[in-house]
Amino acid sequence: MSTIDYIYRFDPKNSSLKSSPPDAEAARKSLENGNRMFAKWMENCRTSDISTEGACYVVECSGVEVGMNRAQGQLPKQAPFAVVVGCSDARVPTELLFGQGFNDLFIIRVAGNVLGDVCLGSIEFAMNALSESVKCIVVLGHLGCGAVTGAVDSYLQPLKFWSKSNPPMLRTITQRIFVAVREAANGLKESWGPDAHSVPGYRQALIDIAVCVNAAQAAFELRLEVERAAKWEIEVLYGVFSLLNHQVSMPVNPRAPVHPDNVNLAYAPTNPREFSTIASSMADLLKPASHEPASSRENATANTTIPSPK
């Protein structure tokens, strides 16, 4: 029976350490290319196209990275090339979706990818203790985020924030996301009009936009942390993983087809004013067909101004 395989491969005849990206740009390309491979694999599995049966997608791994061939008691050196700050959601397999293997990524996962003290402390550890290898920091949001959805629902129905189903520690996460939700709501009002909240699809659009703005705000904060630490060689990027097409991108279009050009990581904002631009751009992209002419829909993605690497 033919299968469509996603394989972690080690070649014992070539057991040397694999090369790591030499700089931030190479690190970004490695992550994006890995996601293109993963998204293609997922699409092939979904469609079960007979022409793709037997296809094999390979992530090269070195056993040396996890201690093979070392004397007993010796530990392998930790040398990730990227720090990824993502959500705890089990549907977002970080190494897999970026096509990376052992010792490639230093991953910090917390609901809503919010930057609390413990999270920031972990990032500072990576920037200092692992400075020889770390080339970039990535904030990874995802569509369908439960933490952002909870924040949006509390924003729309404030009494939910104080309900027994929303315990105190969970409220601290919700509070950190409220700023992104308010920015998203302002973007929708600007794009969809003052009665945006009454337009069908408003809640889902508010969630999707808040996910993007939340990731952008975290990336902005981390850019400041990197600058304060004078780690000029480290680039801060961000993107959103779609559970629909399995692509990481920014801006993110839930309706976008699986295509190499639809994968990209954006540079962290350099100014808080960029948050409103992101929210408005996403609102334009998600505007219902009944609220815009066809020509505007066709150009929605092209007109976004979110800074992405070229």
Language-model segments: residues:
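Divalent-metal-activated hydrolytic enzyme cores
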Residues: 1-77, 102-103, 112-121, 125-134, ...
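Non-catalytic terminal/interface segments that mediate subunit docking, oligomerization
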Residues: 39, 83-86, 96-97
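Glycine/small-residue-rich phosphate/adenosyl-binding loop
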Residues: 79-81
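Residues in well-ordered beta-strands of folded domains
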Residues: 85, 109, 239
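Short glycine-enriched loops at secondary-structure junctions
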Residues: 86-91, 111-114, 142-145
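Catalytic core of membrane glycerolipid acyltransferases/transacylases, capturing the structured
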Residues: 91-109
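Well-ordered alpha/beta subsegment
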Residues: 135-139
